[in-house]
Amino acid sequence: FLSLIPKIAGGIASLVKNL
């Protein structure tokens, strides 16, 4: 589960960066 956190956080960061 802990390994998914950076992946999700990275995905959110990418979405915010694209906005």
UniProtKB/Swiss-Prot annotation:
What are the protein's UniProt keywords? Amidation, Amphibian defense peptide, Antibiotic, Antimicrobial, Cytolysis, Fungicide, Hemolysis, Immunity, Innate immunity, Secreted
Outline what the protein does. Answer: Antimicrobial peptide with activity against Gram-negative bacterium E.coli ATCC 25922 (MIC=25 uM), Gram-positive bacterium S.epidermidis ATCC 12228 (MIC=6.25 uM) and against fungus C.albicans ATCC 24433 (MIC=50 uM). Has an anti-inflammatory effect, since it inhibits the production of the pro-inflammatory cytokine TNF-alpha. Has an activity of stimulation of insulin release, which may protect the species from being eaten by predators by causing fatal hypoglycemia. Is cytotoxic to cancer line cells. Shows moderate hemolysis on mouse erythrocytes (LC(50)=28 uM).
* Protein name, per record: Phylloseptin-1.1TR
Per the record, the major location class is: secreted
Q: Which domain of life is it from?
A: Eukaryota
Q: What's in the GO CC field?
A: extracellular region
Localization (cell)? Secreted
The entry sums up its family as follows: Belongs to the frog skin active peptide (FSAP) family. Phylloseptin subfamily.
Sites of the modification Leucine amide? Answer: 19
Tissue distribution of the protein: Expressed by the skin glands.
Q: Is Ribonucleoprotein included in the keywords of this UniProt record? A: no
> Which GO BP terms, alphabetically?
defense response to bacterium; defense response to fungus; innate immune response; killing of cells of another organism
